[in-house]
Amino acid sequence: MVEVRVPATSANIGPGFDCLGVAVNIYNKFFVEEVEEGIIFEGCADKFKNENNLIYVAMKKCFDKIGYKPTGLRIKIESDIPVSRGLGSSAACVVGGIVSANELAGGALNKKELLDLAVEVEGHPDNVNPAFCGGMTASISDNREVIYSKVKVSEGIKFCALIPDFTLSTEKARAVLPKSIDYKDGIFNVGRTALMISALNNGDFHLIKYACKDKLHQDYRAKLIENFYSIKKQCEKLNSLGVFLSGAGPTIMVMLREEDKDFSKNIKSFLETLKNKWEVRELKIDKLGTVVNNRKL
């Protein structure tokens, strides 16, 4: 049996639209083995127990590339990553499927080939890359090839995810974005993306609040998330380092100093006054990325 563990990811980190992403310590686990016939799913809802299951779709893509034909499959899922909340649940399924398929087929593809294949299936590298590699990454796609660099994050910072009880599909969140942008808005984001990477690298945490600002996606998507601005304002009052929409949302991600012991309790009290229910989870950066049979990919 092959066991694969994939971390949740938070993409964009404010201005780094479709390029920055970070892995955090929430995980999905996949247990896959070859059986005599059929496809057996365990640990997921009945509506996902078919060949359209994203994990199976990713596995088949890998098998087809390698030229491997399993007799049958048993796929067991232990999922802790919330679905459609902007925490990379689909990327985790794609990565888990491709990596487990490759392992079953004898490891025919190397890490680079697996990464390129996963981005081909998922569509964007910002979640897939940190899910594979761990840590924070800056990624681009160049002629279907994934190019990336690890972003060093200085010690002394942690994350806090504010996860609502409602979902937001990536398709809906994409649909509200404009077809084109002003030149000055592009410059605005380029500067703040560079500042974000530099501030995290050098430990200039006081600059993060400036670097989190964005003009390409967050304001458009905030309209789909009730109380986004009031929550953001409250986080800032509670001395957060920075606040941004995690991926396409609706999860709101907060950056904090490691020694901040009061934020989670205080923001939870505020969130309890709102209509929707919000879960508060303090998180650390996952530095390992995808783990296969207890070894780093």
From Swiss-Prot:
It is found in: Cytoplasm. Keywords: Amino-acid biosynthesis, ATP-binding, Cytoplasm, Kinase, Nucleotide-binding, Threonine biosynthesis, Transferase. Gene3D superfamilies: 3.30.230.10, GHMP kinase, C-terminal domain. InterPro entries: GHMP_kinase_C_dom (IPR013750), GHMP_kinase_C_sf (IPR036554), GHMP_kinase_N_dom (IPR006204), GHMP_knse_ATP-bd_CS (IPR006203), Homoserine_kinase (IPR000870), Ribosomal_Su5_D2-typ_SF (IPR020568), Ribsml_uS5_D2-typ_fold_subgr (IPR014721). One of its GO terms (molecular function) is ATP binding. Coiled coil: none annotated. One of its GO terms (biological process) is threonine biosynthetic process. ATP binds at P82, V83, S84, R85, G86, L87, G88, S89, S90, A91, A92. The keyword Cytoplasm applies. PROSITE patterns: GHMP_KINASES_ATP. Its EC number is 2.7.1.39. It catalyses: L-homoserine + ATP = O-phospho-L-homoserine + ADP + H(+). GO terms for cellular component: cytoplasm. Pathway: Amino-acid biosynthesis; L-threonine biosynthesis; L-threonine from L-aspartate: step 4/5. Catalyzes the ATP-dependent phosphorylation of L-homoserine to L-homoserine phosphate. PANTHER family: HOMOSERINE KINASE, HOMOSERINE/4-DIPHOSPHOCYTIDYL-2-C-METHYL-D-ERYTHRITOL KINASE. Belongs to the GHMP kinase family. Homoserine kinase subfamily. This is Homoserine kinase. It comes from Clostridium botulinum (strain Langeland / NCTC 10281 / Type F). The lineage of its organism: Bacteria, Bacillati, Bacillota, Clostridia, Eubacteriales. The gene is thrB.
